[in-house]
Amino acid sequence: MTCNPPASATFTCPKPARPREARIPRAGLTADRLVAAAADLADEAGYENVTLSALARRFNVKDASLYTHVRGLSDLRTRMALLAGGEMIDRIAAAVEGRTGKAALAAFAGAYRGYALAHPGRYAATQIRLDEATVTDSPALRRTAEVTYGLLRAYGLEEPDLTDAVRLLRSSFHGYCALESAGAFGAPRDLEASWDRMIDALHLTLQNWPRRAAD
């Protein structure tokens, strides 16, 4: 349509309406790519700094575009935990394979510590509490339980001592790694030497696990 304004009047021809642009999903954007990018961001900037907005900026898309692939931040963090948990148990299982006793314990602990220090954001993701259904449905988490409990059964432990021993190892490894990452060990004692002595102490504790009083 042609607009011909009258010569004697101040008149501006209306601009033609712009056609509505259809949003096209970013090629190659998948849930797996988002979760991997979120894990990388956690390692680089810190777990608490992983947000949907920060992730959207990485892919140069609107925040709303991410909801096609994840249900929200909670879902993203759950997926990060499963990704990191799978990576971590792969390292641990490979380190423990073919080893028994103290050698297996030291290999397990070393792989745990190595992953925690190399991937602080991913490691932080593994510390969130997951619902029972998610844990049950995750092959990686089931494998984690199998490897961990297998290590401790070799010391002759049975329930409920098995669960108590798992908690002892987890709190020892996690506490040491958290303090080391924070630079909180101020004494001049060599960190590797202290770590090795902790493994010695844990091995002796597991070998001489206290008997429970009869119920």
Name each model-derived stretch.
Residues A93-A124, R142, E159, L169:
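Hydrophobic alpha-helical connector segments
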Residues N60-V70:
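Short hydrophobic/aromatic patch on the recognition helix
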Residues R33-D40, E44, R58, D75-A95, ...:
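Alpha-helical structural segments
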Residues S171-P188, H203-R212:
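Amphipathic C-terminal alpha-helical segment
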Residues E48-N49, S74-D75, A103:
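Residue-level preference for short helical/loop micro-motifs built around acidic side chains
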Residues E132-L168, R189-L204:
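Amphipathic alpha-helical packing segments from all-alpha helical-bundle domains
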Residues M1-A45, A54, R58, S74-T78:
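Basic, helix-initiating cap at the start of DNA-binding domains
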Residues R113-V135, A178-G186:
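Amphipathic alpha-helical segments used for helix-helix packing
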